[in-house]
């Protein structure tokens, strides 16, 4: 039945504003009659003005990005332009920029004094090597200020007190009282190497430390909830803020971790992280755990109950279970908690998983070197991603599986062995080298 016969046009137009832009297109693509309302749909994401102009959809976009260059310097600025980029050396601005512009980016080649022309409702300002004084012109609505390639003396004198999100770009000086008192997000910049701790405001909740930072973090304020450590950080972790909920660790870290906060929810190592030490201090609050490429330690008595997503790196190849004698019987003891729903193994994992998978698992990813037959898949598992080298013969035991994601080359080799299936949208995001297939059930 056509959806138009169920919902009238007015009802559909009430539904569409509540959907993401991609879902709006999918929704109206259900039938030809519904697709006819495309010209009156409004889109909410950011889109480049030039692209939408070619498609004739400028008036359908609420948030446009417009790049001003020497070629389009006299082009009319429309009311639905929210993000303006100034990429020209010519001094062409004669009046205050329109109030509809909430995000402004000034490139390093822009030479005009922009201060008097900053729009009154500006919320975000990005300065690329811009050294003219503008602080007195910044409106009280400004919340986000980002510096890129800007001298440290310029930075200190450009920050308005109402800024809550601050990124310092190439800054390599010291931190201090010049930081806004209401700051919540602080990115100290990729070149920052100084001391950090009580010299940042008590309001900071998210702290990003750059790739050259390798100083002590033992003095960080307890109010920090999100902490990202750069690629050069390699100090032992034995003290962290008590309220920390998310911790991200860069690829150069290979020191011991002897303490993690009790409220930590997310712990992620960089994909290329060289960390390879036992971790025995994971808190019960942890829900997402992602390990780096070189981690290859035992996980027995390591993972907490309550963990939902678990991802191992390419070189992990340790057992995930063991057989123990209990009473008069031999039983399998699993190392991965049953709470895990999404489990991903890396390229070189090739251990037996029969009986060792969590009973609540819904998605499993197996690497290209996995060659063992799998005969025990929990009934909850629906999605399996397979890579080159996997033994397709074991699929006969997987009656509950509904979807597979496999390499194109593997599919061509095994397509006659697969159960009856259909191809599901080869152009799906993230499926560049894969086919997603759906198993047909009798």
From Swiss-Prot:
- Annotated FNIP repeat ranges: 213-252, 253-294, 295-348
The record's section on Pfam families has:
FNIP
What InterPro entries does the entry give?
Answer: FNIP, STK_FNIP-Repeat
Which keywords does UniProt give here?
A: Repeat
The source's superkingdom equals Viruses
**Any idea what this protein is called?**
Putative FNIP repeat-containing protein L170
> Species name for this entry?
Acanthamoeba polyphaga mimivirus
